[in-house]
A protein has these predicted regions:
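Extracellular/periplasmic helix-loop-helix junctions in multi-pass membrane proteins
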Residues: 163-182
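Small-residue-rich segments of transmembrane alpha-helices in multi-pass membrane proteins
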Residues: 25-38, 95-106, 149-153
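Membrane-interface helix-loop-helix junctions at boundaries between adjacent transmembrane segments
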Residues: 1-41, 49-59
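Predominantly late transmembrane helices and immediately cytosolic-facing juxtamembrane segments
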Residues: 118-135
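Transmembrane helix interruption/hinge and helix-loop junction motifs
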Residues: 1, 105-115
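Hydrophobic membrane-spanning alpha-helices of multi-pass integral membrane proteins
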Residues: 149-163
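Membrane-interface helix-boundary motifs at transmembrane edges
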Residues: 14-25, 81-96, 135-144, 171
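Hydrophobic, membrane-facing alpha-helical anchors
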Residues: 59-82
């Protein structure tokens, strides 16, 4: 979760940062942990079961609450530090609105649906754009098509494997645990 938190935070802010300062890594991790803690906070009972099934460790509601509130506090404090030190430039108001919107989505949707909405819309699509720029120096239609052609087989194998796993396991609770383990591995 910590590595995935860093990854999510980095992807969100990498284009907004202009430094290699070590504080950025802390900020990326804090922001990503805020995203995870909002998901965990919004679906506590399911998260407790899934974490227990995956790790055989029991996490309590109290732990999830502390994680949530401490993630809010650390992200707010570090946001001000980032702005003050001019390590990242972003619109604080826009980020607050985005976080509130995500929190509402996580509270309305199921655990999987909420995570999927975040993962696809707020993480994967911007990440694909960043990957295309990294691989081809710019984002344009030709480079997008080239990227999609090179990736489609990998994506199809992954999706087909996930469906096969779903039917082989034939246990929804176990599948959800495997699904989140799979997502953690690819992140």
């Amino acid at each position: 979760v910590i590595f995935s938190s860093y990854h999510f935070g980095e992807q969100h802010f990498i284009s907004k940062s202009n430094s290699k300062d070590y504080l950025l890594s802390l900020y990326y991790t804090s922001y990503g942990m805020l995203i995870f803690s909002m998901i965990f906070f919004s679906s506590q009972e399911e998260v407790i079961i899934i974490v227990n099934e995956i790790t055989n460790v029991f996490v309590s509601n109290e732990f999830l609450n502390i994680l949530f509130y401490s993630s809010i506090a650390s992200t707010i404090i570090l946001s001000f530090v980032m702005q003050f030190k001019k390590l990242i430039t972003f619109n604080f108001f826009e980020e607050i609105i985005l976080i509130i919107l995500l929190f509402v989505i996580f509270n309305i949707a199921s655990l999987i649906a909420g995570f999927a909405i975040y993962f696809i819309i707020w993480h994967s699509i911007p990440s694909l754009r960043d990957q295309i720029i990294e691989l081809h120096s710019e984002f344009n239609t030709d480079n997008l098509v080239l990227y999609l052609k090179n990736s489609v087989l990998y994506w199809l194998v992954s999706i087909v494997s996930l469906f096969v796993l779903y039917y082989v396991v034939n246990d929804e609770k176990l599948f959800i645990s495997l699904f989140f383990s799979f997502l953690a591995a690819i992140t």
